[in-house]
């Protein structure tokens, strides 16, 4: 091969030498006392080689050990200085070099990267001020939301192989992980998503990674926003499929990594767009939706996604050890314009990430090749230690010195030094204690929304995946029953489907939760009754089919529960409307939607939809599509995103880049209105329209 010829050419130019540079010639034997004598201890070449070999392996990562990587470039779509002072987002068209590490979470270094698992996606931006890391996974929620639980769940215990005989090789023991997840209600949302197509992506560049830990963006004038990151693959998400997902761990240990390598070499790799959800710290949504609670995802319709830029992969890694094993990503790597939040998982990981990296590579990990910031000089007070590689000047290793002069570091609220000021946590409203804070004990709503509102055709696929996961991999009968019962908690129909697929007794509906019967859609509740009724300023409608009287009865029950609160004045009695000669029941919860365009068919199913405030509706318009003979999740309609600049409503369409998240074309005015809006992104809107079109 070309690389082999290059290696031989390189070796032919040089004689074998020792680490200190002394050439020894082309000899490959040890020194002996005679032709058949004992090896001599004075053979320092042998000792140097063997000592280095014995120390080649560094401690394996406790999680994310199996990985690969790629280099690329990030392009900022525009100037985002209204949200952050970070320089890589400071100008339209600004390019920033980056590197990304892809991984599985549970498997060992040599395990199959096709195993059903959470998949890591860590990106490092080499920005002007230093290195900025976005560390996340391909699933928007997490198992736990307090870091003290993490070692038991993640590191070496529940998600690892059976400790008795370490099987399955490098993968999870199904009984151990099932036992843990079914005992924890807050793990339900992520557990259900791992069991779906999201647990077995076919290509790393076609996953939908998320930085599920929230963080802060800070502007030059000190304005703060609480944010979360999302990556969106422009080629769409691609999974292995149910059968391949269970066959590949046996046949293709490096399939996903090889797929990434070849796609970059052939220039067919997909790009990823960076999207964020942002809200100010005085936004009342922070009280309704605990954005620091990573077991639940934020509501896109209430906190719209803003597309900030695009990540392009353009170069493969050259050495796995240097660029993947030796690359130290951590959430503590932030730059000016980015800061931390009170997220308990984040706070614990700020300590844990650095601790485990120091354990693996020593105290000078920042001096290793791809950990060094290429655009920013290093002026810290670190000295000596194993692995010291930088020639430091003979300066005093402390700030206050008469010889070199002491600088007056001002504590300012704005400008370059604003991140040093004492009031950086002035938004903190809670006392310090040892109790676990949460504003939302509802652990089933997000799992229900994921399972009952998938893309068309995915629900059967997910049930089939559950069948394989709960039967083929050797899960005990008790474990199968426990999983079936847990799925019944978030949806009675889902529990029955899973139970039937795996051949266990169908669970009874849990009376503590509202169970849809003939509904299809996403239900997200902030915090409320056991029926999942949202509180606060939520607007939405509940639609139920009279073909299923139970759905009308449940809707009425939901309405009664909701109307008993302080906002009962917003609720009106159930109505019957005739649409397309099929009567549907409509129970409005704050009737702000204009139903003039509503055109429903026999198979329309929808549980609860939340939209933004009335101003959002007036600003962007909201027309419903033709859903005749279609099962469509209206939550996929989405809205427009803007840069939310403080300009007039009319100017927002002209200045802010708009983008349609999801839409359905069909015979409706929604897409027509979208395409008529002033926008420099009209081609992208049309592509999305074609992709999500409803076929007659």
Curated annotation (Swiss-Prot):
GO terms for biological process: hydrogen peroxide catabolic process; response to oxidative stress. Residues 187-211 are annotated as: Disordered. Gene3D superfamilies: Catalase core domain (2.40.180.10). GO terms for molecular function: catalase activity; heme binding; metal ion binding. InterPro entries: Catalase, Catalase_AS, Catalase_clade2, Catalase_core, Catalase_haem_BS, Catalase_sf. GO terms for cellular component: cytosol. Heme binds at residue 353. SMART domains: Catalase. This is Catalase. The active site is at 64, 137. Occurs in almost all aerobically respiring organisms and serves to protect cells from the toxic effects of hydrogen peroxide. It catalyses: 2 H2O2 = O2 + 2 H2O.
């Amino acid at each position: 091969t070309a690389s082999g010829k290059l290696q031989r050419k390189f070796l032919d130019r040089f004689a074998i030498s020792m680490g200190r540079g002394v050439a020894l010639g082309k000899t490959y034997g040890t020194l002996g006392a005679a032709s058949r004598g004992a090896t001599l201890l004075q053979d320092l070449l042998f000792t140097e080689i063997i000592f280095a070999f014995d120390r080649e392996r560094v401690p394996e990562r406790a999680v994310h050990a199996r990985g690969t990587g790629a280099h690329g470039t990030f392009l900022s779509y525009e100037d985002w200085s209204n949200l952050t002072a970070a320089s890589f987002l400071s100008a339209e068209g600004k390019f920033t070099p980056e590197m990304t590490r892809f991984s599985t979470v549970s498997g060992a270094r040599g395990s199959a990267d096709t195993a059903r698992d959470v998949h890591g996606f860590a990106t490092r931006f080499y920005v002007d001020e230093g290195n900025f890391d976005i560390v996340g996974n391909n699933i928007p929620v997490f198992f736990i939301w307090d870091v003290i639980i993490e070692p038991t769940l993640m590191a070496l215990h529940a998600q690892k192989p059976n400790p008795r005989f370490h099987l399955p090789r490098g993968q999870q023991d199904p009984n151990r992980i099932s036992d843990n997840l079914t005992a924890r209600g807050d793990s339900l949302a992520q557990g259900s998503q791992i069991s779906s197509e999201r647990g077995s992506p076919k290509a790393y560049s076609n996953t939908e990674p998320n930085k599920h830990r929230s963080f802060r963006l800070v502007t030059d004038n000190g304005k703060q926003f609480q944010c979360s990151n999302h990556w969106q693959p422009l080629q769409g998400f691609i999974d292995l499929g149910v059968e391949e997902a269970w066959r590949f761990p046996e046949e293709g240990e490096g399939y996903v990594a090889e797929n990434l390598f070849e796609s970059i070499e052939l220039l067919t790799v997909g790009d990823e767009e960076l999207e964020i959800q942002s809200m100010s710290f005085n936004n009342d949504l922070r009280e309704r939706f605990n954005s620091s609670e990573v077991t639940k995802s934020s509501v896109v319709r209430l906190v719209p996604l803003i597309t900030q830029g695009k990540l392009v992969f353009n170069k493969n890694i050259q050495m796995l050890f240097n660029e993947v094993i030796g690359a130290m990503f951590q959430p503590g790597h932030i730059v000016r314009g980015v800061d931390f939040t009170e997220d308990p998982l984040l706070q614990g990981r700020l300590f844990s990430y650095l601790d485990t990296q120091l354990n693996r590579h020593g105290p000078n990990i920042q001096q290793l090749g791809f950990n060094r910031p290429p655009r920013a000089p290093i002026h810290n007070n670190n000295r000596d230690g194993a692995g010291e590689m930088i020639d430091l000047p003979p300066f005093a290793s402390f700030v206050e010195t008469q010889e070199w002069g002491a600088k007056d570091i001002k504590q300012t609220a704005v400008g370059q030094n604003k991140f040093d000021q004492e009031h950086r946590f002035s938004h903190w409203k809670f006392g310090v204690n040892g109790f676990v804070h949460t504003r939302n004990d509802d652990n089933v709503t997000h799992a229900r929304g994921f399972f009952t509102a998938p893309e068309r055709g995915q629900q059967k696929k997910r049930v089939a995946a559950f069948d394989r996961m709960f039967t083929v991999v050797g899960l005990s009968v008790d474990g199968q029953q426990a999983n079936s019962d847990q799925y019944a908690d978030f949806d009675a129909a889902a529990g029955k489907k899973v139970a039937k697929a795996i051949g266990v007794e169908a669970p009874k509906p849990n009376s503590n939760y509202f169970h849809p019967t003939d509904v299809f859609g996403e239900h997200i509740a902030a915090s409320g009754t056991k029926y999942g009724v949202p509180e606060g300023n939520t607007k939405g409608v509940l639609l139920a089919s009279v073909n299923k009287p139970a759905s009308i009865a449940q809707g009425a029950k939901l309405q009664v529960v909701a109307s008993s609160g302080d906002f009962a004045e917003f609720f009106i009695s159930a109505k019957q409307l005739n649409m397309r000669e099929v009567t549907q029941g409509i129970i409005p919860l704050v009737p702000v939607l204009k139903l003039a365009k509503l055109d429903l068919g026999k198979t329309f199913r929808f549980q609860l939809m939340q939209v933004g405030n009335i101003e959002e509706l007036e600003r962007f318009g909201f027309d419903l599509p033709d859903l005749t003979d279609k099962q469509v999740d209206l939550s996929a309609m989405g809205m427009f995103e803007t840069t939310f600049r403080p300009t007039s409503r009319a100017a927002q369409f002209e200045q802010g880049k708009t983008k349609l998240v999801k839409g359905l074309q069909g015979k409706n005015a929604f897409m027509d209105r979208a395409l008529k809006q002033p926008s420099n992104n009209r081609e992208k809107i049309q592509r999305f329209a074609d992709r999500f079109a409803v076929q007659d």
